[in-house]
Amino acid sequence: MLSVTDRIKTVSQPQNGYVPKMLFSFERYEDCKELKPVKSALASIQGLAVDYLSRFILSGDKMKSFNISLLGAAKVDEVYESDEATKNVLSLLEHVTGLNRESAINVCKIVCYDTAYRAGLKYYQSPDETSFEDNLFDNVLILTERTLILLKDIGTIINDGLTFEGGYTKLVSSGDIDYLTVDTLIDLKVSKDDFSTKWSLQ
């Protein structure tokens, strides 16, 4: 049983992909703000932080926006027979209020718990063990602002984090979309890459 993204990793596509770049239209958004380099180890934290902070600002629902982080904290607590991880996430969430530096710092700490849920405790590294950088927090604010502008231009978000219950198969058992408007499914990518045929097939 695979997720959509795991299944795509096993698919051999033709040179330009099954859903080639030529089928897409591209728009450039320019805010004259330059992203700063961050260590590769922080790239996934940056992407998740932008995703979750954007969801929270749009919905106002902290528990839903940071659900995976909370599930990860619960996994940590289960293994260590404690409730400290969950308490820490909830404490950090109290200081997530919007598009500001304090929120960015706390969100980056919160998403560290995702790994415990997504990949297991073997790969989990607590916020206290993670070496954060100022560049990371700056980038999260810039990228979140860009995301909000993009989504506003696309149209009103009517739902987010949707799954496809009843639409999975014996081969693909999970997959979701980030945002839904009245006429568009949106899968948000926070990446320095230009285009990927894996993204388009997804």
What residue ranges belong to the model's regions?
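Charged, amphipathic alpha-helical stretches
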Residues: 2-54
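Active-site metal-binding core of divalent-cation-utilizing nuclease and nuclease-like domains
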Residues: 153-182
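Hydrophobic, aromatic-lined core segments that form the binding pocket/scaffold
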Residues: 49, 53-155
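Short non-domain terminal segments
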Residues: 22-24, 130, 135, 162
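Conserved catalytic cores of phosphodiester-cleaving nucleases, focusing on short active-site segments
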Residues: 178-194
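Active-site-adjacent loop/helix micro-motif of nuclease/hydrolase catalytic cores
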Residues: 193-201
